[in-house]
Amino acid sequence: MEGERKNNNKRWYFTREQLENSPSRRFGLDPDKELSYRQQAANLLQDMGQRLNVSQLTINTAIVYMHRFYMIQSFTQFHRNSVAPAALFLAAKVEEQPKKLEHVIKVAHACLHPQESLPDTRSEAYLQQVQDLVILESIILQTLGFELTIDHPHTHVVKCTQLVRASKDLAQTSYFMATNSLHLTTFSLQYTPPVVACVCIHLACKWSNWEIPVSTDGKHWWEYVDATVTLELLDELTHEFLQILEKTPNRLKRIRNWRACQAAKKTKADDRGTDENTSEQTILNMISQSSSDTTIAGLMSMSTSSTTSTVPSLPTTEESSSNLSGVEMLQGERWLSSQPPFKLEPAQGHRTSENLALIGVDHSLQQDGSNAFISQKQNSSKSVPSAKVSLKEYRAKHAEELAAQKRQLENMEANVKSQYAYAAQNLLSHHDSHSSVILKMPIEGSENPERPFLEKPDKTALKMRIPVASGDKAASSKPEEIKMRIKVHAAPDKHNSIDDSVTKSREHKEKHKTHPSNHHHHHNHHSHKHSHSQLPAGTGNKRPGDPKHSSQTSTLAHKTYSLSSSFSSSSSSRKRGPPEETGGALFDHPAKIAKSTKSSSINFFPPLPTMAQLPGHSSDTSGLPFSQPSCKTRVPHMKLDKGPTGANGHNTTQTIDYQDTVNMLHSLLHAQGVQPTQPPALEFVHSYGEYLNPRAGGMPSRSGNTDKPRLPPLPSEPPPPLPPLPK
């Protein structure tokens, strides 16, 4: 079988004598005329293929069918404009891109008679064209002996350029030359695809003044492609190729790329409007670098102009064309962008169109070198992943960056310290804001207005609150001011409210502990971490919500135990959140708490759900859409001046009288009609929160406050100052 195939393949390679004695020559066509007809047919096939949106591989296959057909038949008997549509119709089916017969006929008519309207499909002329095309397809099949599998040089070009690790420019140019060889020459009838590929690479090296070094084995690169190739043969064929390019008239050099023309019309690209002369001049300049030969110069102008004139087309060869297609795509893009359309020699025009075509076409060859070239380009273009998001950026991006920020916080121990200090500062600020807000509480009439404020961005909320509390702008409030407020606190009210809230939080905590304490605490720990990250980020909803509920709790304590208990019970019925968050919220959002206290006293019941507002449940409000800008603004104030006082109150918490706390919790639970919870969980919470959950620790600290009306002492060593936040 292999021997038969080789014999069949040899059948389609002809000597110079056979080419000079072709049927068309015998019927009186001179050599130049016959070559011109072949180039015109190739141009028509290229134009039709692009309009039909078939791959460059299909177009190249149709061109080879045409060349072989006219080695058996004459141009005088079968007009090139009739054979070309039939050859493309057949090649499209062979390459598995079949097109409707009606579509092929209409496209052929549009290419040959652009000024005329499309034929009526019911007219006699159209039906006659259909019959002629089908008959011609049958004649082509019989003439070719049903040998429809075509090997193209593009595959070998890609393989060789990959083997020698040629530059992208060299690979693209070589691939382009392979397409030109099909469009402009009869090399496909004289030499095997590997030989043609060597000629194309050699021509590209000469043209661009490149040189491929000898291998470590002492062999030249072409010996790895085809053992029969010699340097003399390459020089001879290169010279012949250049001569053909020089002889090709400009009208054939200019590839009529329909797709490119349409794109040019739509985009009105300026670079495509540049003069033909300019492009040719550029090509000549490039050629002069490699050689002063007039033939080389002609080749250069041809190839360059063709590349510039070509528009994105499909990849050019079957397998090889597919591999080359990638290279050609790169080449086509570069050339097209840099140069306007020019008159190209037919081969050049085809090359360029082919390169453009490569952009849209699949080729098995692309798996070879083209893929490599494309992958290199893609790799280089890939952007480096962005660095960890900074706090400012995170705040700006809000929720989108939340996940990344959470991961960062989990992975960085430094965040733990910052959280610790942050919680302590929040505690102090909470006390401060609590007293100030309580003083001004009467200003706000109803709870409803308050909630919108809380839900609005924190900055707005701060503005609302601060005018009420102290008349200062949220953003403008400074650490010094905060200190002053703390000193001026109304000790009795504030402490009472704090104590109540502490006991409530304690109560909630115990309750949660009695429930799957381990699982809940782990969840709390993670949520706590995230909530911390969220606060700076300004995206978390949990925190703001927590403060509100927690503040409400404290407010209730202010008003009455019964009211607070009823409220807490109602609120707890919402989703249960980590208790830590509640405690943290109390500290973090003092202003909010105070405000909520005021609002709760006025219209408390309608908005709140049922269930004791315990620390664990304070996170229930985490679902609420409170924006954290206020947290952001407040954070800098608290953090700047306040060290981790009792680090979330952990240090103070340890001094709490256990029995008193338990008794208080029992009494509160009984008031609410709930059974007291198990004490052991409480101890676990203390240790856990102390080491893992600074925020949880805040809750115990609160209970500690219950025993001690005084504010927790500031830490001996304040935490390092945090970077200033954006205003």
Curated annotation (Swiss-Prot):
The modification N6-(ADP-ribosyl)lysine is found at residue 487. One of its GO terms (biological process) is positive regulation of transcription by RNA polymerase II. The modification Phosphoserine is found at residues 117, 390, 497, 501, 566. There is a cross-link at residues 343, 417, 483 (Glycyl lysine isopeptide (Lys-Gly) (interchain with G-Cter in SUMO2)). Residues 509-532 have a biased composition (Basic residues). Residues 386-427 form a coiled coil. It comes from the Eukaryota. GO terms for molecular function: 7SK snRNA binding; cyclin-dependent protein serine/threonine kinase activator activity; molecular condensate scaffold activity. The modification ADP-ribosylhistidine is found at residues 489, 532, 558. Residues 711-727 have a biased composition (Pro residues). ADP-ribosylation on serine residues by PARP1 in response to DNA damage disrupts the phase separation activity of CCNT1, thereby preventing activation of CDK9. A motif (Nuclear localization signal, and interaction with Tat-TAR RNA) lies at residues 253-270. Residues 302-326, 486-591, 692-727 are annotated as: Disordered. Residues 482-552 are annotated as: Histidine-rich domain (HRD). Residues 486-508 have a biased composition (Basic and acidic residues). Keywords: Acetylation, ADP-ribosylation, Cell cycle, Cell division, Coiled coil, Cyclin, Host-virus interaction, Isopeptide bond, Nucleus, Phosphoprotein, Transcription, Transcription regulation, Ubl conjugation. The modification ADP-ribosylserine is found at residues 418, 476-477, 533, 551, 554, 565. It is found in: Nucleus. Its main location: nucleus. GO terms for cellular component: cyclin/CDK positive transcription elongation factor complex; nucleus; P-TEFb complex. Regulatory subunit of the cyclin-dependent kinase pair (CDK9/cyclin-T1) complex, also called positive transcription elongation factor B (P-TEFb), which facilitates the transition from abortive to productive elongation by phosphorylating the CTD (C-terminal domain) of the large subunit of RNA polymerase II (RNA Pol II). Required to activate the protein kinase activity of CDK9: acts by mediating formation of liquid-liquid phase separation (LLPS) that enhances binding of P-TEFb to the CTD of RNA Pol II. The histidine-rich domain (HRD) region is intrinsically disordered and promotes the formation of phase-separated liquid droplets that enhance binding of the P-TEFb complex to the CTD (C-terminal domain) of the large subunit of RNA polymerase II (RNA Pol II). Cyclin-T1 is the predominant cyclin that associates with CDK9 to form a heterodimer called P-TEFb. P-TEFb forms a complex with AFF4/AF5Q31. Component of a complex which is at least composed of HTATSF1/Tat-SF1, P-TEFb complex, RNA pol II, SUPT5H, and NCL/nucleolin. Component of the 7SK snRNP complex at least composed of P-TEFb (composed of CDK9 and CCNT1/cyclin-T1), HEXIM1, HEXIM2, BCDIN3, SART3 proteins and 7SK and U6 snRNAs. This is Cyclin-T1. It comes from Equus caballus (Horse).
